[in-house]
Design a protein with these regions (language model features):
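Flexible "arm" and connector segments at domain edges
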Residues: 1-56, 62-181, 185-247
Length: 247
């Protein structure tokens, strides 16, 4: 069933009779669309909208086909190579299912083998630079922890977070503030990991909670927020918080 889509993309990229827009696209120019489509898949899942999920998965699949066709046009690889590579990877990572090994190697052993094959020396190699910063921090910390570079429990992680907060307060220049805020955020992600909390999900939930409360405050006011004191705004905020908590 994938063949019709592959043919559509081949025709769109045809140098003579294809679509002018599709013809000139590169990996770099469509990369933002690939990221956007992945987020739209996640959004459809979050909204439990199966019709939208079906459509968004199709859009994401199109991105895979598009990148594969761009690669095929320059002789690098094609869609079948992509499929073969992921099939090989999944088979390699599940020898207890697809192989004859009685005891499967550990996950890190498998990943280390893959990194060696791809020329990656560090346990942190291969974590995509294009990931959202919060998600990339989580992945980097998990990678480091898997090879033993981690605090033994939550207590020193909490201490580190407080230490970073103090360093933010002590910063004396914009550059120092920038750096220390980054360290503070990184430490907060690390604390979330030690509590087995997905920091990305937790921040998304907190942002949505703020949005609901703010919308309620906004709807209840009969004057501009800029005309109100911080005490008045805090009072309205607490009302909105109580209202939402009561259901």
């Amino acid at each position: 069933m994938i063949d019709p889509l592959l043919e559509i993309m081949r025709l769109l990229r045809d140098p003579d009779d294809g679509c002018e827009w599709d013809q000139v696209q590169t990996f770099s120019t469509i990369a933002p669309y690939t990221i956007e489509e992945a987020y739209e898949v996640a959004d459809a899942i979050e909204r439990d909208d199966m019709v939208a999920l079906r459509d968004e998965l199709g859009d994401l699949l199109l991105q895979v086909v598009f990148h594969s066709q761009i690669a095929a046009d320059s002789g690098k690889f094609d869609f079948q190579d992509v499929v073969t590579a992921i099939c090989d990877k999944m088979t390699r990572r599940h020898p207890h299912i697809f192989g004859e090994a009685e005891e499967s190697p550990g996950w890190e052993q498998l990943k280390a083998g893959e990194r060696e094959q791809s020329g990656q020396a560090s346990a942190l190699d291969g974590v995509a630079l294009a990931l959202p910063a919060l998600l990339r921090a989580q992945k980097i910390q998990k990678r480091a922890a898997r090879v033993g570079f981690d605090w033994p429990d939550k207590a020193p992680v909490k201490d580190k977070l407080l230490e970073e907060l103090e360093e933010v307060a002590a910063a004396s220049s914009d550059e120092e503030v920038h750096e220390e805020i980054g360290d503070l955020l990184f430490s907060a992600v690390n604390l979330a990991r030690h509590y087995k909390v997905d920091a990305e999900r937790a921040l998304a939930d907190a942002t949505e909670k703020f949005t609901k409360r703010f919308n309620l405050v906004e709807a209840s006011l009969d004057k501009n927020m800029q005309e109100m004191s911080i005490e008045e705004l805090e009072a309205e905020w607490q009302k909105a918080k109580a209202s939402l908590a009561a259901g």
